[in-house]
Each structure stands twice: as C-alpha cells, then as structure tokens.
Amino acid sequence: MALILFFIMLVWHRGTQLERQYCVPLHFADYVQPLGELHDDPEIPRLTHNLVYLDNSRDFESIDRDILYSILDKDAKRASAYWFISATVHDEPSVMRYEDETYGTDYIFRVRLHLGFKDHQRVNVYLRQIVSDLIESGELPPQNRKHSIYGKSDVGNFKFCILHKVVPPKAGLSSMDEMVLNVKYAIRHIAGSKAQWYGLDTSSLIVERVPLLVNQSGRSTRRIERMEHEKAYI
C-alpha cells in the first residue's frame, strides 16, 4: 500500500511539473481591453451573468493562455462578469480570507481564496458571498435576476468552465513523460473531477478539453495547391 501511495504521489508531482513546464502564461493586463470589448458587444448573446474559471496562476499578473483562448476564441463567451478563482491552502486549520484584483473594471475579477486545511473548498458558496459583498460595496453592478423560485435577486446566475488538459497524439513528449501524464489524468478521473473537489453545481458546468501542448516543429510547412480544371456550367 505504501508503494502504491508513493507511486501516485510521484506521478502526480511529475505530472504537475510537466503541466507547468508546457503552460503558456500571458500577461493578463494586455487582455483587459479585448475582454471589455466582448463584454460590451451587443451582437453576441450573453452566456451568463457570471462566468467562472478555476485558475492555477500564482499571481494576478499572468494567466494560462488556454483560459483566455476559451473565452475569446472558442465560441466567444460573453458575460456580465468574468471571474478567475484560485485557492491557497494554509497550515492554519481555519483561515477564510480572500483578495481580489479588478484591473480598474467592474466586470473582471481575479480572486484568490485563502483557506485553512480543515476548510472545504466550496468555491460556489464562497463566490456567492463575494459577489454579494462586491455588489453591496458598489464594485460590481447589480445583476437584476428577475426569474427565480426565490424571487428577484441582485445576484445573477453562474456558469463554471473547467478546462481538462489532455495529451494529444504525437505531442513531442518522451515516452516516459507521456506515460506519466496519462497516468495522472487516469488518477484524476478515478479520484473525481474538479467539480466534485470544489463542490460545483454540475448543472452549471461547461467542460472543455484542451491539448497540453502543440508540437510546432511537427507542422508541415508545405502548402496544398489548388488544381485547375475545366469549369462546368449549367
């Protein structure tokens, strides 16, 4: 049993190292304007009031490229507010604090939860409290949810978008690293999804699978040629 636990810990640690190695961090402030343009674009239907991503960034300056790609490029997701949530677990048993960064907007919120090791990481519960706090302080406009069995509310609905990394074919990894990542993702599947870990409402989930990396050197530089043929007219 001890050997199995050691193997799992080793695979998880090495897999996390590889994920960080191949993560492409972007300077978040450079994308505040594109997010604002999407937020204000009336031609794109609003997906939800609050679009939430779980973010592993260690600071508020950078963010994983895949998150911004999901919002701006992969079926542009317009929302009243964009939330990027990360959590830090402390050695103290009962810590419940949060810090946030808005980049001078009232629709972009980077939030870091500081939780004790005994506290459940119930992101949806904490986030609703934070949204209520920010609406009360005037930092977030009321979202005016009119239709609910609980009556009207200033807090709108939520969508949680979870990105699952996958290893694409011919990714350029060594056989050992590819095996480590595939084993880690198999363990993750057995242990439960992020939705279960963070207590998210599964009815409000968007799950997207993204390749861990793209082997640029494997792309062909040749162009396909258009053939000439006799035109057929009716």
What residue spans do the PLM features occupy?
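Hydrophobic core segments of alpha-helical transmembrane domains in multi-pass membrane transport
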Residues: A2-H13
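Cytosolic C-terminal regulatory domains/tails of membrane transporters and channels
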Residues: R20-I234
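Transmembrane-helix exit/juxtamembrane "anchor" motif
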Residues: V11-Q21
